[in-house]
A protein has these predicted regions:
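Metal-dependent amide/peptide-bond hydrolase catalytic core
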Residues: 71-195
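Generic "edge-of-domain/loop-turn" microfeature
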Residues: 57-58, 125, 159, 202
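Histidine/acidic-residue-rich, glycine-tolerant segments that coordinate divalent metal ions
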Residues: 1-111, 192
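Anionic group-transfer/hydrolysis microenvironments
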Residues: 25-27, 121, 198
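Active-site-proximal loop/turn and secondary-structure-junction residues that shape catalytic pockets
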Residues: 28, 156-158, 199
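Short alpha-helical interface patches
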Residues: 12, 31, 51, 125, ...
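Single conserved hydrophobic/aromatic residue that forms the stacking wall/gate
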Residues: 194-202
């Protein structure tokens, strides 16, 4: 449950005097019995948002007397698809997903309000910051373009996971030298979900 307990625990001193923390994440897509690792950024951070688009309702036969929130909201969803493809470097990892678009009403009634919810993932804090900036810019532009009122709630709740490179290599080397039954492999960053990751035997 966002924002999780780690931040509060750290602020209360749970890591005082601690040099390193080792964490384990179980993934069903990985080969059973193996240990996978990666120095640096390895798992994406997350944010989520809710956007309320307030227009003016009306009858379907008289669109000129209304301000269609569904049209404005649909434009936002479409424009959002360009954030990753046109605002991020090809070498950055980011994704924006719209998981909910609530505009249910009657077939002959122009909807006065829609609510949109989305999920944001970024492999670095800088990537997440760029996506957040663009979402806020688009919501503001929506007001200017369609004359609607937008209320945006943006929650940046989980940072990206960063493994200290030197310590990570030390742990991997130690496991390899222990000659245990399981393999030790380096993996690609986990971007947004549990994907089958390409791996390289070391």
């Amino acid at each position: 449950v966002p924002p999780g307990g780690a931040k509060a625990m750290i602020e209360n001193g749970v890591l005082d005097g601690v040099d390193h923390v080792l964490g384990v994440h179980v993934m069903s897509t990985m080969k059973t019995g193996n240990v996978y690792y990666r120095p640096g950024y390895v798992q994406t951070g997350r944010a989520f948002f809710k956007l309320k688009v307030q227009g003016k309702g009306g009858h379907g036969s008289s669109p000129h007397m209304a301000n269609d929130a569904i049209v404005a909201g649909s434009y936002f969803v479409t424009a959002l698809q360009t954030v990753v493809s046109r605002r991020l470097s090809p070498f950055e990892t980011g994704v924006v997903t719209i998981g909910s678009f609530d505009g249910k009403g009657q077939f002959n009634v122009i909807k006065d309000v829609v609510e949109i919810e989305g999920d944001v993932r970024g492999l670095t804090d800088a990537t997440k910051a760029t996506i957040e900036k663009e979402i806020k810019r688009l919501s503001k532009g929506l007001e200017d373009m369609y004359g609607v009122t937008c209320t945006l709630e943006y929650n940046d709740d989980y940072p990206a996971l960063y493994n200290d490179p030197e310590f990570t290599e030390y742990v991997a080397k130690t496991l390899k030298e222990a000659d245990l039954e399981f393999g030790v492999e380096i993996c690609e960053p986990v971007s947004y979900t549990h994907l089958t990751l390409p791996t390289k035997r070391i």
